[in-house]
Amino acid sequence: MQKKYVVALDQGTTSSRAIVFDHDANIVSVSQREFTQLYPNPGWVEHDPMEIWASQSSVLIEVLARAGIHSDEVAAIGITNQRETTVIWEKATGKPIYNAIVWQCRRSSEICEQLKAQGLEEYVRENTGLLLDPYFSGTKIKWILDNVPNARAQAERGELLFGTIDTWLVWKLTEGKVHVTDPTNAARTLLFNIHSLTWDNKLLEALNIPLSLLPEVKPSCSVYGTTRIAGEGSEIQVAGMAGDQQAALFGQLCVEPGMAKNTYGTGCFLLMNTGTKAVRSNHGLLTTVAVGPKGEVNYALEGSVFMGGATIQWLRDELGLIRDASDTEYFASKVADTNGVYLVPAFVGLGAPYWDPNARGAIFGLTRGANRNHIIRAALESIAYQSKDLLDAMTKDSGVSLKRLKVDGGAVANDFLMQFQADITDVEVLRPSVCETTALGAAFLAGLAVGFWESVIELEHKACIDKHFIPNIDAETRVRLYAGWQDAVARTRA
């Protein structure tokens, strides 16, 4: 039977999805299932790894059944995943010894402080590109080994395996035959040397983590094993995987140095490909691993802001100013400007490039003439201002002045936000026709790995732009508006 499709498994923080793409990179079928969020203590976040697998395997079966696609027609399955989330399971039984500790979980803060006290902060920064923060997997692994009864003894005997979610899914898909990760996910563990592309012995020793626990690191664009859908039909190759933000970067075909994308979700993630050079940030960004045009390792600068779409949710759920996120464009467009109002959504502090956990949200510039439309417009503009903060930091670090920014995520449907993003950055903003770029990136990697597509050049002919947003304000206005934003941010940090 002819191979007509590639399936992307998109395992996210709140739901598992499966998306079928055809040879023209069009979406054929989508299936999605949410799963339980667990909050056992303040600041702790967990998932049940078996529920993640149950939700992911069920949507894989469902997405094919819904479109009437036979497993023989599927060329490959690609994987993209929430990064950093940590699972440890028994090699012999496949049973997790503890819930997955989610990237948002802060329980390992004390371990990070211990590493800082040991003088490891600069070593971590130089060799992993990351900050010493509970966000990343390494300290989560140590917490499990230290706190789950018998875990450390089992680990020392080589009876346990660790994986981020990509590794866990491949292990389950291949029925325990393959224990593997890719460089983009390995680079988020705090244990991976991004220069030698190997696990870092000094950090493993500092965290007391046995090497036997860790998966083999294989290229993002390669075949890892095979699986059968529900144990039936012919075997399908499991091929191609990347962490969610790197998958989106590849899905946008940002495979050359200086190309960048911004994902507008709950927060915003801006990544710029820096090619074969790992650029160290001096402006609050992370250095991470990306995927090059032939599936090889490239590097990227990454900046994240905590409050993107979450700011709009706040307008809806807490203030009641809108009924639906899509209402914001209508209200923002009813006024010519914000009437001097700036909203700084530092509800949980500020992310990159400030990294200020003590900053708090505020609305500045309120006068008697300020109304709902001005506040809604200021909320939308805050998303673009924060993205400009990241873009300016990237320009300083990389020496590359960006001319075009590719965008994806739910908020890119908002034309007002996209136009203001172009205006305030003085950069052309490109919105793709297929906004599911994270899943598309996983599909591209899988398809390239098995020869479903020949090269990135072929893929470029399939990537269509829905709309170009061209900067449309003068330099003087741009400088004045951004100066107002910078002043507002400074006051939230005072």
UniProtKB/Swiss-Prot annotation:
Sn-glycerol 3-phosphate binds at residues 13, 83-84, 135, 244. ATP binds at residues 13-15, 266, 309, 313, 410. Inhibited by fructose 1,6-bisphosphate (FBP). GO terms for cellular component: cytosol. Keywords: ATP-binding, Glycerol metabolism, Kinase, Nucleotide-binding, Transferase. SUPFAM superfamilies: Actin-like ATPase domain (SSF53067). ADP binds at residues 13, 17, 266, 309, 410, 414. Glycerol binds at residues 83-84, 135, 244-245. Pathway: Polyol metabolism; glycerol degradation via glycerol kinase pathway; sn-glycerol 3-phosphate from glycerol: step 1/1. GO terms for biological process: glycerol catabolic process; glycerol metabolic process; glycerol-3-phosphate metabolic process. The keyword Nucleotide-binding applies. Belongs to the FGGY kinase family. This is Glycerol kinase. The gene is glpK.
